[in-house]
């Protein structure tokens, strides 16, 4: 048997392992002969199996209970803060609505300024009637929309007034009143601009009629005859009239065309003035609505003023009662004597019995 060479073992002779390999199995006779010939082998060391891995247990009941308590307290905090969140949400909705109305008011003011510049022009040849009519229609629609938005905002304040605080309701009412006043001033400016436009249209019409009206003497008269002599025969008179009518046809057609143009221009200006008058009437209805809303706010302010006056009267009455009580206390000398005697008695008791 050829022994196998192994390295790194202390039981080897010059690095050669003389024993059996792990894959070889000895018979009993061979084991006896080998044990008698060679040195005795060391006794095998029994390998103790390693204990199985055991998971360490730790009581975490307290941690679980503390986590449950913290979660429960967090849920209770959320439930208690729901009214505050609801009030904040309502305040944010009101702020967004008021901001939107303010932005629309500023845009409408810019359009009104442009309309004012165009309406104050008095030139006959630089009259932008189409642009003025478009701006008038747009501003009228914007004013109607703003009026509806402010009414919705006021309804929102009324609906949420009982749920919000007194100071928040007062602040909301103040904002609504300021928006209403801005809309009223803008409507008044729009009405004045329309009145200026109406006056300018009247002046333009008068000037156009003055310059376009031709006197009767300036109109060319049809001649009675071609030769200037008296006409005896009816055929010659008819022929002369035919010739005269043929000669006057171009001028007559031009005058008729000018009359048609004047009629169309006057009709367009009449339509424009009618639109302006209808717009002024609509603005009057908007003013009535704003006056009604301001009247309601005035009643609210009057109630607040009455409450303030009542509180002031109560404070003055309480102040007078306190002054009376103070005068009665200061005038009562026996009370001062009694207090002094009580202090002396307590001092004597303290010195005699406790010292």
Swiss-Prot record:
UniProt short sequence motif IxM motif, positions renumbered to this chain: 245-247
Record membrane topology: Single-pass type IV membrane protein
SMART domains the UniProt entry points to: t_SNARE
Keywords of this entry: Coiled coil, Golgi apparatus, Membrane, Transmembrane, Transmembrane helix, Transport
GO biological process: early endosome to Golgi transport; Golgi disassembly; intracellular protein transport; positive regulation of protein catabolic process; regulation of Golgi organization; vesicle-mediated transport
Assembly description: Part of a ternary complex containing STX5A, NSFL1C and VCP. Part of a unique SNARE complex composed of the Golgi SNAREs GOSR1, GOSR2, YKT6 and VTI1A. Component of a SNARE complex consisting of STX5, YKT6, GOSR1 and BET1L. Interacts with BET1L. Interacts with BET1. Interacts with COG4. Interacts with GM130/GOLGA2. Interacts (via IxM motif) with SEC24C and SEC24D; mediates STX5 packaging into COPII-coated vesicles. Interacts with VLDLR; this interaction mediates VLDLR translocation from the endoplasmic reticulum to the plasma membrane.
Function: Mediates endoplasmic reticulum to Golgi transport. Together with p115/USO1 and GM130/GOLGA2, involved in vesicle tethering and fusion at the cis-Golgi membrane to maintain the stacked and inter-connected structure of the Golgi apparatus.
Name of the featured protein: Syntaxin-5
Organism name: Mus musculus (Mouse)
Gene that produces this protein: Stx5
